[in-house]
Each structure stands twice: as C-alpha cells, then as structure tokens.
Amino acid sequence: AATTFQKPLSVSYAMQRAMRTMSSPGRGGYAAARAAEETAFRCRSLAAELFGVPSPEQVVFTSNATHALNIAIRSLVPEGGRVAVSGYEHNAVTRPLHALGARIKVAASPLFDRAALLRAFENSISPELDAVVCTHVSNVFGFVLPIEEIAALCRAERVPLIVDASQSAGI
C-alpha cells in the first residue's frame, strides 16, 4: 500500500531500472518507449488475470487508489445523485461524494457484524441508486465486508457497485 513504510528492496531496484531503461510508453518507436509499452502491457495482463478482467485493455492505471476512486465515483454518480455506502468508508470515498452533493444512505449496522451489515445493505439498495460504493476491507479495523453478497444484491437491483479494494487487492 502507498502508506506502508520501507518498500521491499526489489521495488527500489525495479523503479531504478525502469527510470534508466524505459520512457514514454505508447509514445514512440524507439527502444525505451517500446520497453515501457511492453512492460505496461505485461502489468495490465497480470492485473487482468488477478482481478478476473476479461482483457488487459480494460485495465487502467492511475496515480493511486484515491485517484481511481474519484474517477469511478465521478463517472457514475451525478451531482446530487443517490448512493449507498457502508460505515467503513475512507475519505477517498466520502469526500468526492460530498463534493458532488450526493444523497448518501449509510448501511448502518453494529461494528464488525457481517450479517447485520448485509441486512442493512439489503434495506439500502434499490433501483433508484446511482451506485453503491463500498470498501472490501476497512483500512482502520481490518474488518472484511461481505463484498460478494453485497455485489449480488447490487446485481439483483441493477445498481453499479464501486469496490475500494485498496486493502485487499490480490488476497
């Protein structure tokens, strides 16, 4: 995660190598640009495989998770739109929703009670929502939300789901 201190030495080496040997992916036919483009595509392919995305071309890299969440939220939620969230959301979710003037419905439940949280989402999700935005794992508590079940509720009501997987990607 971006907030972790002391990245593994392999990360430092990979970044140094990239800065020495790569440049401008997709922007030229010279060796450094081709190397960067091939590396980016390999990364997209691995990410697509990890997350079950049908095609590497559907994988987008952003500066960080906050940027990605802003893109997703601002793409699906209009100004004044209706959204359901859990009570575990990070500021990267709540701030853009408030900036949009979204009408936010919190699926409130006692802390760490997955069954109660799922019931709260059952009562909160309806077709008039523009989206449900939900973390998978709380960055504060480490609580794992029942994301598969929440996703099923969203599918049943045909409501888009934005998942903040910052703390759980790959597990």
Residue ranges of model-derived segments:
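Pyridoxal 5′-phosphate
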Residues: A1-I171
